[in-house]
Regions:
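Solvent-exposed alpha-helices and their adjacent loops that cap or buttress functional pockets
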Residues: 15, 31-35, 63-67, 88-91, ...
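A short, charged helix-loop
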Residues: 65-94
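Short clusters of hydrophobic/aromatic residues that line enzyme substrate/ligand-binding pockets
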Residues: 58, 83, 123, 127
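A broadly conserved detector of short glycine/acidic/proline-rich loop/turn motifs that flank catalytic sites
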Residues: 46, 54-55, 77-79, 102, ...
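Alpha-helical interface subdomain recognition
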Residues: 90-246
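Glycine-rich flavin
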Residues: 1-60
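Flexible, glycine/proline-enriched loop segments at strand-loop-helix junctions
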Residues: 27-29, 58-64, 93-100
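Internal, well-ordered alpha-helical segments in soluble enzyme and binding-protein domains
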Residues: 1, 11, 36, 69, ...
């Protein structure tokens, strides 16, 4: 986003040198890691404002995920702080990044569950040798494997910036969110009651999956994008199984 602004006031170079720029996009009610940022990109309607951290007032917000530092930001927009008026595909990029994170999170949960199922012995044999545990883990892996190519396809088409590409991002966000939800819950279940204690880290994965699922657009919001795309497609027997042309 900084690179596309005509007036980034030198913050692009500062960001490349390591300065933190927090992003307050209209789709997110709070700004993540605003307390560690040197400057913030904030929205006032469709306008983009670049504000130094000294010119805002931050209030810490509670988060379901204890490792996400979220803040509400009080600030005053002015012509001097305005640097643009087009958020472009920022929301799509944020949603795609969240989807990619959830795929990685889901896979890590499965890997932890597999390792524990191999190591935990009950009634003289590893719990992973039972069909119930095998099927539970396998179902989560299938969910991830079906979501992963959806995320890859969305990433490949993101630069096109059409309704079709936005629908692919929406599909990726929904699919990855569902996979992360299933995998994180499965991993907790595979570990038994211990899975929701501070003795293991699984509850952090579950909480992050929940938080990311609603960051950069909820499933309902992305479902509306997909619905809008479907409404543009031809209907009828000749079009039902036709390949989509973007």
């Amino acid at each position: 986003l900084l690179a596309r602004l005509d007036d980034n006031r030198g913050w692009l170079a500062k960001a490349l040198a390591g300065a933190v720029i927090a992003l307050g996009h209209p789709s997110n009610p709070f700004v993540a890691d605003a307390d560690s940022a040197s400057a913030l990109l904030l929205a006032d309607g469709d306008d983009i404002h670049l504000i130094a951290s000294d010119d805002v007032t931050l209030t810490r917000a509670e988060s379901f995920d204890p490792f996400r530092r979220l803040f509400s930001v009080e600030w005053t927009p002015s012509p001097a702080t305005k640097v643009g008026s087009n958020w472009g595909d920022t929301a799509d990029r944020g949603a795609l990044l969240a989807a990619a994170q959830m795929i990685g999170l889901a896979q890590r949960c499965i890997d932890l569950a597999v390792a524990y199922a191999k190591d935990r012995v009950q009634f003289g044999k590893p719990i992973g040798s039972t069909q119930a545990v095998k099927h539970m883990i396998s179902s989560a892996q299938v969910k991830v494997e079906f979501a992963r190519p959806v995320v890859h396809a969305a990433a490949a088409e993101l630069p096109v910036a059409t309704l079709a590409s936005r629908a692919r991002v929406a599909h990726a966000k929904i699919a990855a969110g569902a996979a992360a939800d299933v995998a994180s819950r499965m991993a907790v279940q595979a570990h038994g009651a211990m899975g929701m204690t501070w003795e293991v880290d699984l509850h952090f994965f579950l909480k992050r999956a929940f938080a990311l699922n609603y960051a950069w657009g909820s499933p309902a919001v992305h479902g509306e994008t997909i619905s809008a795309r479907i409404a543009t497609l031809p209907t009828g027997p000749d079009a039902t199984f036709a390949s989509e042309v973007t």
